[in-house]
Swiss-Prot record:
Belongs to the universal ribosomal protein uS4 family. Part of the 30S ribosomal subunit. Contacts protein S5. The interaction surface between S4 and S5 is involved in control of translational fidelity. The lineage of its organism: Bacteria, Pseudomonadati, Thermodesulfobacteriota, Desulfovibrionia, Desulfovibrionales. GO terms for molecular function: rRNA binding; structural constituent of ribosome. InterPro entries: Ribosomal_uS4, Ribosomal_uS4_bac-type, Ribosomal_uS4_CS, Ribosomal_uS4_N, S4_RNA-bd, S4_RNA-bd_sf. One of the primary rRNA binding proteins, it binds directly to 16S rRNA where it nucleates assembly of the body of the 30S subunit. With S5 and S12 plays an important role in translational accuracy. This is Small ribosomal subunit protein uS4.
Length: 208
């Protein structure tokens, strides 16, 4: 699991946008980025012209930190995406979206990806009836993700329907809150990812 010593709010401010690292708090007026939408530190407000490399690096760091990954694992996903058929950038985002911890987050069973990762490691979910404890599992079309019966009274699980109503569920997933389950209906497409990101900049960075 990727660990950062810096506060999550400072990470968002450094990357210049909300990465939703603190879950529901990011949707409220308590969000630090809404109050101070500039980089942390003494010179955070200063305007500076970034080189092409700096822009590419910043975009890669933003996406990597949003999904909570270390550089080695993120780069391995890029290599896999580059070797697959299709557009490398779109392939990369599809791989990131199909991680089990991200799917748990998208289904509304966790407030953030980091919380989803922790819940998966604790064995709270099953995939196709088998307990899953590896956050990086790549889900496939037709996979059924369920909350284990003994964990269904957890507050964060009980609030799943409310979270889905507030945050929405992507079209490639089907959330069934009352039955504590979700189904992968299709593979995620680029248009399914609403978060503003320029994956082509990441491709350009790693292609140097």
């Amino acid at each position: 699991m990727a660990k950062y010593n810096d506060s999550k709010c400072r990470i968002c401010r450094r990357e210049g946008g909300k990465l939703f690292l603190k879950g529901d708090r990011c949707y409220t007026d308590k969000c630090a980025f809404d109050r101070r939408p500039y980089a942390p530190g003494q010179h955070g407000r200063a305007r500076k012209k970034n080189s092409d490399y700096a822009v590419q690096l910043r975009e890669k760091q933003k996406v990597r930190r949003m999904y909570g990954l270390l550089e080695k694992q993120f780069h391995s996903y890029f290599v896999k995406a580059d070797m697959s058929k299709g557009v490398t950038g779109s392939n990369l985002l599809s791989i990131l979206e199909r991680r089990l911890d991200n799917v748990i987050y998208r289904l509304g069973f966790a407030n953030s990806r980091s919380q989803a990762r922790q819940m998966v490691r604790h064995g709270i979910f099953t995939v196709n009836g088998r307990k899953a404890t590896i956050p990086s599992i790549q889900v496939k079309v037709g996979d059924v993700i369920e909350v284990r019966e003994k964990n269904r009274k957890m507050p964060v699980i009980a609030e799943a329907q409310e979270v889905i109503a507030r945050r929405g569920c992507p079209s490639w997933l089907e959330a069934d809150g009352p039955n504590f389950r979700g189904v992968v209906k299709a593979l995620p497409q680029r248009e399914d990812i609403q978060f503003p990101m320029s994956e082509q900049l990441i491709v350009e960075l790693y292609s140097k």
